[in-house]
C-alpha cells in the first residue's frame, strides 16, 4: 500500500487536505478530500497539475498532468488527462468532503502523481464540453485559489 497526502493552501481562504491510497500498480487509487473555504453550494474544478512547483503560487504548477497527450474530459471519459478529477461539490457553508476511486491516477509506476500539485479552481470545470479550445485544455475552470504538492505519506 502506497499513501500520499496533499495539504491545500493559497491566497484565498480555500484550504484542506487530499489523501491518496493505492494497493498496487494495477489497482485504482482512492482519492479522499476535505476542503473548506469555497463558495457555498458550488462546483469547483479539481485537478492534478504537472509540476510540484508552487514558487509563484498555484500558477507555477503548470497544466493538467497529461502524460498520454489526451484532451481534457470528465473523470469517467475515455479521453481525459490523468489529472482530470472533475469538480468537488460544496455544501451550504462552502465545505466539500468526498472520496472516489480512479484507475487513471497512480502513486506507483512511471506516471505517478507523487510530487505533482493538486489545484482547486475558482470556477466550475465544464469537463471538456464547453465547445471551445480552452475547454479541451482546462475545462474553463478558472483561477487557482488553492493548491498543494502531493507527498509520500506514512
From Swiss-Prot:
Main location: cytoplasm
Transmembrane segments: none
Disulphide linkage map: 58-147
Basic and acidic residues: bias regions: 123-136
An annotated GO cellular component: cytoplasm
Region (Disordered): 122-143
Cofactor: Cu cation; Zn(2+)
Keyword Isomerase found: no
Residues bound to Cu cation: 47, 49, 64, 121
Family annotation (InterPro entries): SOD-like_Cu/Zn_dom_sf, SOD_Cu/Zn_/chaperone, SOD_Cu/Zn_BS, SOD_Cu_Zn_dom
Residue sites binding substrate per the record: 144
Primary enzyme class: oxidoreductase
Binding site for Zn(2+): 64, 72, 81, 84
Pfam families linked to this entry: Sod_Cu
Free-text comment on the cofactor: Binds 1 copper ion per subunit.
Subcellular location: Cytoplasm
Signal peptide stretch: none
Catalytic activity, as annotated: 2 superoxide + 2 H(+) = H2O2 + O2
EC number: 1.15.1.1
A single MF term (Gene Ontology): copper ion binding
UniProt function note: Destroys radicals which are normally produced within the cells and which are toxic to biological systems.
Subunit details: Homodimer.
Family, per entry: Belongs to the Cu-Zn superoxide dismutase family.
Protein name (database record): Superoxide dismutase [Cu-Zn]
Amino acid at each position: 500500500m502506497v499513501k500520499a497526502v496533499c495539504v491545500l493552501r493559497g491566497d484565498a481562504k480555500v484550504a484542506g487536505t487530499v489523501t491518496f491510497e493505492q494497493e498496487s500498480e494495477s489497482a485504482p487509487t482512492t482519492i479522499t478530500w476535505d476542503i473548506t473555504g469555497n463558495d457555498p453550494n458550488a462546483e469547483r474544478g479539481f485537478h492534478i497539475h504537472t509540476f510540484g512547483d508552487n514558487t509563484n503560487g498555484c500558477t507555477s504548477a503548470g497544466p493538467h498532468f497529461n502524460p498520454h497527450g489526451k484532451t481534457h474530459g470528465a473523470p469517467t471519459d475515455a479521453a481525459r488527462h490523468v489529472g482530470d478529477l472533475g469538480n468537488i461539490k460544496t455544501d451550504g457553508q462552502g465545505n466539500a468532503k468526498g472520496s472516489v476511486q480512479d484507475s487513471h491516477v497512480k502513486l506507483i509506476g512511471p506516471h505517478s502523481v507523487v510530487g505533482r500539485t493538486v489545484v482547486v479552481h475558482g470556477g466550475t470545470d465544464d469537463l471538456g464540453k464547453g465547445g471551445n479550445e480552452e475547454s479541451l485544455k482546462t475545462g474553463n475552470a478558472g483561477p487557482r485559489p488553492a493548491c498543494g504538492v502531493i507527498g509520500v505519506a506514512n
